[in-house]
Every structure is written in C-alpha cells, then in structure tokens.
Amino acid sequence: YHAISVTVWGRLYRRALFEKELRHYPLRLGEDSLLNIQIGCQQPRVRFIDYVGYGYVQRGGSANRSPLDIGYCVKFSEAVRAELVRHRDILGDRLEFYLLLNKMRWYLVYLRKSHNPWAGGTEFARGINAEAGRYRAELGGFFSRCDRLLLRMDRRRWMRPGVLAVSTLMRWGKSLKRRLAH
C-alpha cells in the first residue's frame, strides 16, 4: 500500500465540480495533476485525506513505465500554463511561480531517471534554472536542498553522473527512512 495525498484518488470531490468546465488533455502522465489544478482554481477550499491506502496494480504497457522524455515535460508544462492562464484572475501575480513549481517537479522526475539523456542544455532546462534564481527563498519550502542541487548540477553535461549519484542516494535514503519507520 502507498500513501497518496496529492493525486485524484486522495481527495473527495463534489460532483458539481465535474459538471463544470473541466478540460481533458490527451496526456499519458500527470492527468491527475491537471485535474487538481483545474479544480483548485474553481474551489476555494480543498480538504486533504491524510492517508489513502490502495492496492497498487501495474499492468504491462502502463503509462507509469513509459519513458518520460524532455519533450513530454515541455508539453505538460504548456498544458499547465494554459490552465493557469485561464484562471489568471485567481492566481494574480503568483502565476509565474506556480508555473515554475510545476516545471521543476516534472523536470526533477526526468533528471532522476538514469536512462534519460542529459537535457540541461535545452531551452526548457535553462529557463527553469533562470527562473529558480528569482524564487530561490520560496522554492526552499517546496523542494529539498538536494533537489535544488540536482538542478544546479544539471547545468553542466559533465555533471550528469553526479546528478545520477545524488538522486540514487536520495532514493536509497528515502527507502531506508520508510523501512525504519515501520
């Protein structure tokens, strides 16, 4: 069982939210994030369920096992941008910050995959690093120091092995903490 609080199945929704103007994007990963962004922009209060246990079954050909390429990160970012711009009146001057949070989250997932090639030189990655500099203090509340270190290291191709080493150590540390907690 896994504890999931940020995904669609970790919340209770009013049916009326689904009868409003929800858009459905043809994306193979992250559809739940887009749904939550749309609902979050419509609903002033959201209540989280502290723990959600579910039997996780993964089937062959599952999107979770699909390779995540940099093009997908860009495509997903564009879909999120479309939703946040659509609700600009609610977000105000926080729009760019929320876009950066989304881009960083997906790019960090991409970075941690050892089979993914270096993408630190792409316009997408360079843009994230440039924007992160403007919000350095605020990002500390959302991303660990190690996450931010991965982004800084990824600016240089020759540091790709270091990025993978740090991300592996982070994964092992997280796994060890989880095992010791039980």
Labelled PLM ranges:
Residues 52-59, 65-91, 106-135:
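Catalytic core of nucleotide-sugar-dependent glycosyltransferases
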